[in-house]
């Protein structure tokens, strides 16, 4: 593993930054750019925690199919493991956010596969 850098300019839609077990021991991350009306799509992160950092615009977070919260930049939200969620851009401006996911670990500090 080595130090990596990602410049956040000129990203059109999606750019993976860290791939778990390749670039990092337990983290995965990237940047997402959504235009008005676009969404990531409902998904569940299973045994993974997720942090979403809103850099620009507004994100509407849906949890289990219901509107949870509208976040304006700069904002951060934590999504626990095994939660079905979606990120939607309902504003007229572009939404840019960084996501960071981390696999759960046992108390002993061993990576939970």
Locate predicted features.
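Glycine- and acidic-residue-biased ligand/ion/polar-headgroup-sensing regions
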Residues: 47-49, 53-59
């Amino acid at each position: 593993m080595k130090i990596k850098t990602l410049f956040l300019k000129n990203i059109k839609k999606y750019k993976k930054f860290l791939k778990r077990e390749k670039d990092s021991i337990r983290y995965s991350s990237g940047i997402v750019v959504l235009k008005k009306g676009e969404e990531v799509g409902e998904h569940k992160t299973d045994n993974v925690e997720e942090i979403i950092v809103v850099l620009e615009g507004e994100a509407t977070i849906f949890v289990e199919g219901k509107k949870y919260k509208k976040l304006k930049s700069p904002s951060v939200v934590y999504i626990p493991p095994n939660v079905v969620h979606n990120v939607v851009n309902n504003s007229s401006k572009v939404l840019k956010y960084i996501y960071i996911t981390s696999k759960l670990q046992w108390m002993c500090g061993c990576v939970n596969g």
